[in-house]
A protein has these predicted regions:
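Conserved glycine-rich cofactor-binding loop
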Residues: 6-7
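Conserved glycine-rich Rossmann-like NAD(P)H-binding loop of the short-chain dehydrogenase/reductase
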Residues: 20-36
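Conserved NAD(P)H cofactor-binding loop of Rossmann-fold oxidoreductase domains
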Residues: 80-85
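Substrate-binding pocket helix/loop in short-chain dehydrogenase/reductase
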Residues: 88-90, 96-101
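Active-site helix of classical SDR
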Residues: 112, 148
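Residue(s) in the substrate-gating loop at a strand-loop-helix junction
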Residues: 132
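SDR active-site lid
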Residues: 162-229, 236
Length: 255
């Protein structure tokens, strides 16, 4: 199962899993894109691909998906879907911030609860949690996202300690900036313009690195120089020093 499978890391994870011979369940909001991806992966790799179009920020839709997955034998769950916002929390749309929390944390938790009992009972399985280096430190002007990823980071590493003895792998992916291709100047977002090209990772590289790490049951995989430096900063530099510096940088994304 791959959530957020219509683009970016999610699409790359689906492609890499198909290349490795896995049948797939693709989850995202945009059904038409998922159907096109499913046809392409089946044609290229000969695997069975099922589409479950779901808005994971909708509690009822998430509950329905979890009920469906709980009755299936799921070997790997890639909890990838997520969104981010930038700018002062007081100036952001409150409902969108709530939707971000539902998507980035509650849906991740619900999906994990849906599949982890069967994995433990079976004695095999793997969960890839897409957290973030942003979850390692306070980030003004990215508050909801950073807080949501702190939840995912902690959930992943805590759960890994619970299920390792049962043969279940749990790996946290804490990526930095990722993109499928370099945009043209006209298409570049503020993030593309602020973050230098050499700090970006390709979604294909991140997907392969993540699945290799999950296979080895690594606790955390941190691809890229920026994410590695943020992980170090979050662990060793006092938070009262990093917060204002990082906050000024992230404010640019909201402008």
């Amino acid at each position: 199962v791959v959530t957020g499978a219509s683009s970016g890391i999610g699409e790359a994870l689906a492609t890499e899993l198909a290349r490795r011979g896995h049948s797939l369940i693709l989850v995202a909001r945009r059904e038409e894109i998922l159907q096109d991806t499913a046809v392409d992966l089946t044609k290229r790799f000969g695997v069975e691909v099922e589409v479950m179009a779901t808005d994971l920020s909708d509690p009822d839709a998430t509950t329905a998906l979890c009920s469906a997955l709980a009755g299936r034998e799921i070997s790997i769950l890639c909890n990838n879907a997520g969104i981010a916002t930038f700018g002062p929390l007081a100036e952001l749309d409150a409902e969108y911030e709530r939707a971000q929390v539902r998507l980035n944390t509650i849906a991740v938790h619900d999906l994990t609860l849906a599949v982890i009992p069967q994995m433990v009972k079976r004695g095999s399985g793997g969960i890839l949690m897409v957290g973030s280096a942003a979850g390692n430190m306070p980030i003004p002007n990215n508050a909801t996202y950073a807080a949501s990823k702190a939840f995912v980071n902690s959930l992943s590493e805590s759960l890994r300690g619970e299920v390792a003895a049962h043969g279940v792998h749990v790996t946290l992916l804490a990526p930095g900036p990722v993109r499928t291709q370099t945009p043209t100047p006209e298409e570049a977002s503020i993030v593309d313009r602020v973050v230098p090209d050499f700090l970006w990772n390709s979604s294909e590289y991140v997907a392969k690195s993540s699945l290799d790490a999950l296979e080895r049951n690594k606790m955390r995989v941190v691809p890229g120089a920026l994410s590695k430096s943020m992980s170090v900063a979050g662990g060793y530099i006092p938070r009262n020093l990093t917060a204002p510096i990082v906050g000024r940088f992230y404010r640019k994304f909201g402008d």
